[in-house]
Amino acid sequence: VAGDYKRQFDPTCAPFEPIISDVFVTEATFGLPVFKHPDAKSQIEILINSIKKFPDRCHVIGVYSLGKAQRLIKMMRDFGWNDTIYIHGSLVKICELYKKFGIDLGKLEPATIQDKPKKPHEYYKGKLILAPPSALSDVWSRRFPDPIIGMASGWMTVKQRAKQRGVNLPLILSDHADWNDILKTIEQVSPKEVWVTHGSEEALIYECEKRLSLIHI
């Protein structure tokens, strides 16, 4: 039983290890051929380049509080981004826990407007702010004047979904395997049966039936 899994690089956790099994239960969150995630490092480069391109604006990026936020922060650090990263209150304790387990996330500060030496418009120029996706459309995000709104998610492959969320900077960074990685994992596990759940089951089941007949010919 795989649960949620990804095959892309993540500096904050151990990689997924396929184990040969008779029955494999896989998720199918991105179980359609349209979902082919780019290399995660390319998305970090897009974010860094955008921050440099718009030094007078802040970037507010939607990330899930557990896992996605810490992965993005750590990858930014590994790319040499040493500036303070500002985080929503819901991320604080989880990031502190990661630090206790030895994950160096660099300097983080709460994304507040109190006790700052300048007004928010001036203080947050050129800064990176991370928040849960729900906060992007909330009153919370309106404290940052003229922000560039981004979202780090596999769903950003779908341009219409990004548009609906008011996302200016879609970053295709996912903690779920895409179509190709799901199929690669199935081949590596080499099961006699595949059970598919949570997502686009029919398309993946159809593809599995074809591939399993070749694996166990």
Where do the PLM segments sit?
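Core dinuclear metal-dependent hydrolase active-site scaffold
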Residues: V1-A14, I46, F54, T112-P145, ...
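Residue-level preference for the first positions of well-ordered beta-strands
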Residues: V23, D56-I61, T84, G126-I129, ...
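A C-terminal functional module that forms or caps the active site or interfaces directly
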Residues: I149-E187
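Conserved small/polar residues in nucleotide/adenosyl-binding loops
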Residues: I215-I217
